[in-house]
Every structure is written in structure tokens, then in C-alpha cells.
Amino acid sequence: IFVFGYMMFGGANAMIYTNAIQAVIMLVVAIILLGSGAHFFEGGISWFWEKIASIDPNLTKNFNQTSPLFRDWFEVIFCNFVIGIAIVCQPHIITRSLMLEKGASLNKFLLYTIIVETIFFFVLFVGFYARIEFPDLTADGQAIKMDGIMSMYVVKNFSNFTGLIIIVGLISAGLSTLEGLIQSVSTTITSDLIRPMLYGDKSDDETLQRKLKNVNRIVIIVLAVIAIFWSNQQLANPKLSVGILAQNGVYAFFAAAFVPVLQGIFLKNVPRIAPMAASITAIIVHFSVYYGQLTPYTTGEVRNPAVAGTIA
């Protein structure tokens, strides 16, 4: 509610400042988490991987046949490659460069992005740290839920103060993405769907802009209600991880926005029906593949949203 609230009234201006604060916190937390497992490498890299392999040999393999998400090259490499291309074309990613005050800052922006993103990628190793700490994924005889493993690792290895900072950093990672999605989804719905239906080709003026701003705020409220409902469903009926729930919706959005964004960047005078048809088709295909269990990768209790998104 807090995030939806300040995005509703602050918009992109608020997001610039909150994202900057969140990014600094996340970077500090990433370094703390990576450093927390330094002692696992005292015997060298080979000892570290041997320790991981002794817990579960599948953890050191390229693919894991027993996993519902990492079974073969198609899931691990191809799907992630396609989704990666779609991600960099998303409105909430592209608009980051538009927030630069000067065009000359673009190269510096890209350099910082690559450095920080590389550090964030290495945070995946913290999952190995947690698995070494909890080899059988239990604590005090109780099974640890998938979404609670990192929290348990933080509680066990850090003081209350440091643990609080880390938890704030983990929350910031979700909030920064949520802000971008709120901005891009609400703007897309308002500008590309509602405006053409209600106002046609009416030229921009102060009155119309004010009306669209109010419409956008209503859209954000509706999105908040939907988000609260789905979050409650995940809490009541968890399916492996909240990450699966998030990926299912986000990848559907990625698929829907991919073609329209590319057309907007590289083509001129595109018929309105073209991006609309592409978006509608992508959404229908994504959810049909996922919920209709149309492939071997999207059957069973846990299904891979990346496969549905790739096909869409």
C-alpha cells in the first residue's frame, strides 16, 4: 500500500529518489552477504564445490533432472536468453536512461550498471552459503520454507542490527522492481488503452493531461487491489516460492510489451492494430501454456513461467 501510494502521487519523480536510495542499500547488502561466506573458501574453490556436491551432487551440475525449473539446456539457457532480451526492452528498464540529466552521462551510467549488476549476479552464491548452513533445509527439526531460507541464514549469521539492514536491502530489491512495474503498467494502460477509447485522437492540452493523471491514479488503485488479492492467495496457498508467482505475471507483461516496444523504437507509422494484436496474442499464449499445461515444462504442481514467456 505504501509503495502504490507514493507512486500514485509522486510518479517518476519519486521513483528516481527512492530507487537511488534502494540501489545504495542493495549494493551494501550484496557486499555484506558475499563477504559472509568468505570462510567457506578457506580450503579453496575446489573444496567449496566438493562441500556443495556432498550435500547434493545436482547442485554442481549444469542441469538438474529432478528440478521443475532447471532440467535441460532449453530451460536453463535458451529460455533465460529469450527472457533476457525481452527484459532489456521493457519500459521500466529503458526509462532508466531517460532519467539522466545529460546525454554525456550515458557511458558512465552503463559502466556503473555493468559493475553493480555483476556484483548482484554473484549474490546467487549466497544461496550456496545457505545450503551449507542448512544442508537438509531444516532448522530445529522443522522444514524451512523456500522463501524463508535466506531469512534463516541472515538470522543465524548476523547481529540484530546488521540483520535488519540486510532485510531492508532484500525488501528494497523487490520494491525497486515493483515501482518500475507500477509506473510502466499503469502508464501503458492509461496511455495506450484508456486514452484512445475515451478521448480518441484529441490533442494534448492541460485539461486532458489533468484528466489522464487522475485516470492513472485510479488505475494504480485497481492494480494495488489486484496485487493484494494475489499476494494473499500466495500466502494462503504457496507454490514453491513467491518468485514463481512474480515471474508468471512479470513474464506475461514482458511478452506483451516486447513487440510494441520494438515497433515503437525501430518502425514508423505502425498501424495501431499491430502492437495491440501482438500484445493480446502474447498474453493469451503465455497464460494458455502456463495454466493449460500445454508443454512438459508447464505440467505438474510447479511450472516454469520462463517457458510460457519464451513461447509467447
PLM feature spans:
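Membrane-embedded helix-loop-helix hairpins and adjacent transmembrane boundary segments
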Residues: 1-312
